[in-house]
């Protein structure tokens, strides 16, 4: 019932003061925590927005990503944070892994470790049950567990790659430039010396046969074959010695027990 002559249907706040009124409800803040509600992973079926265009939440910043014309893709790129978000299941035998730097990686199901390719990260992710950061679950902080292996600086391109061998003095193929180099200088030095020694021995044997058996070779033509074999083996060994002497050497950055 109206009181003091005020109509009960009149507004509680007069028009003269309505411009100074601010809403009392707290503003809506989009949840950005990794524990926020996320859409089902690897599916292109997302709730459409008001205009009927399919959208999905970014798995990094939770912004809406427009899927119009992108439903045939496996991943889409967020226009806000520029990170990738999967909308389909990975190919057969593959799996998605999210690096702590938010880079979306794809690797084999059987992979135990994977290295982040970003120059400002270069993190080695152990895909064991402790450090598994899969897109099937909300991202959890990676535990600082040292992986087995070492990071090697390529002798050709200078890039760093993960080398999983537990012993030095072996050959390694750089995944960046696809060239082969020796990890450590002991192996090429040792093999170069060995091939030089064997090559010189074969050449000395060939010279000895040439000088010591000329008369015998005139009677038995097969003797020339032994000369040729000795010289040929010596030449091959010297060529291999040149190869090992000129091979590039890659040096490890850090070694993990």
Curated annotation (Swiss-Prot):
> Where can this protein be found?
Late endosome membrane; Lysosome membrane; Cytoplasmic vesicle, Phagosome membrane; Cell membrane
Per the annotation, the residue ranges of the short sequence motif CX5R motif are 107-113
Q: Where exactly are the transmembrane stretches of this chain?
A: 192-212, 227-247
Positions of modified residues (Phosphothreonine) = 22
Q: Which domain of life is it from?
A: Eukaryota
Cellular component terms per the entry's GO annotation: late endosome membrane; lysosomal membrane; phagocytic vesicle membrane; plasma membrane
Gene Ontology MF, one: phosphatidylinositol-4,5-bisphosphate 4-phosphatase activity
Pfam families tied to this protein: Tmemb_55A
**Has UniProt tagged this entry with the keyword Membrane?**
yes
Q: Name one GO biological process term.
A: negative regulation of phagocytosis
- Residue numbers spanned by region Disordered: 1-43
Q: List UniProt keywords, sorted A-Z.
A: Cell membrane, Cytoplasmic vesicle, Endosome, Hydrolase, Lipid metabolism, Lysosome, Membrane, Phosphoprotein, Transmembrane, Transmembrane helix
Bilayer topology term: Multi-pass membrane protein
* EC number(s) recorded for this UniProt protein: 3.1.3.78
- Catalytic activity field: a 1,2-diacyl-sn-glycero-3-phospho-(1D-myo-inositol-4,5-bisphosphate) + H2O = a 1,2-diacyl-sn-glycero-3-phospho-(1D-myo-inositol-5-phosphate) + phosphate
Would the keyword Heme be found if you checked this record's keyword annotation? no
Biased segments, Polar residues type: 13-23
Q: What does this protein do?
A: Catalyzes the hydrolysis of phosphatidylinositol-4,5-bisphosphate (PtdIns-4,5-P2) to phosphatidylinositol-4-phosphate (PtdIns-4-P). Does not hydrolyze phosphatidylinositol 3,4,5-trisphosphate, phosphatidylinositol 3,4-bisphosphate, inositol 3,5-bisphosphate, inositol 3,4-bisphosphate, phosphatidylinositol 5-monophosphate, phosphatidylinositol 4-monophosphate and phosphatidylinositol 3-monophosphate. Negatively regulates the phagocytosis of large particles by reducing phagosomal phosphatidylinositol 4,5-bisphosphate accumulation during cup formation.
Please name the PANTHER family in this protein's record: PHOSPHATIDYLINOSITOL-4,5-BISPHOSPHATE 4-PHOSPHATASE, TYPE 2 PHOSPHATIDYLINOSITOL 4,5-BISPHOSPHATE 4-PHOSPHATASE
Q: What protein name does the entry list?
A: Type 2 phosphatidylinositol 4,5-bisphosphate 4-phosphatase
Q: Which organism is it from?
A: Homo sapiens (Human)
Gene designation per UniProt: PIP4P2
């Amino acid at each position: 019932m109206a009181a003091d002559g005020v109509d009960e249907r009149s507004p509680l706040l007069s028009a003269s003061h309505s411009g100074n009124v601010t809403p009392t409800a707290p503003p809506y803040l989009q949840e950005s925590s990794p524990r926020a509600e996320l859409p089902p992973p690897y599916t292109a079926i997302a709730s459409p927005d008001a205009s009927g265009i399919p959208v999905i939440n970014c798995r990094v910043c939770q912004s809406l990503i427009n899927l119009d014309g992108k439903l045939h893709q496996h991943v889409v790129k967020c226009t806000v944070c520029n990170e990738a978000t999967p909308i389909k299941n990975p190919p057969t035998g593959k799996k998605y892994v999210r690096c702590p730097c938010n880079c979306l990686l794809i690797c084999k199901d059987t992979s135990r470790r994977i290295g982040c390719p970003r120059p400002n990260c270069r993190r080695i992710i152990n895909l064991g049950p402790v450090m598994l950061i899969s897109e099937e679950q909300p991202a959890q902080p990676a535990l600082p567990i040292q992986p087995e292996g070492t990071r090697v600086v390529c002798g050709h391109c200078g890039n760093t790659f993960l080398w999983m061998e537990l012993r030095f003095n072996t050959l390694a193929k750089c995944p960046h430039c696809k060239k082969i180099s020796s990890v450590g200088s002991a192996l090429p030095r040792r093999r170069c010396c060995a091939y030089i020694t064997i090559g010189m021995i074969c050449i000395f044997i060939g010279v000895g046969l040439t000088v010591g058996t000329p008369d015998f070779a005139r009677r038995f033509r097969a003797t020339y074959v032994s000369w040729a074999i000795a010289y040929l083996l010596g030449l091959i060994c010297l060529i291999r010695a040149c190869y090992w002497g000129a091979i590039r050497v890659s040096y490890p950055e850090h070694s993990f027990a």
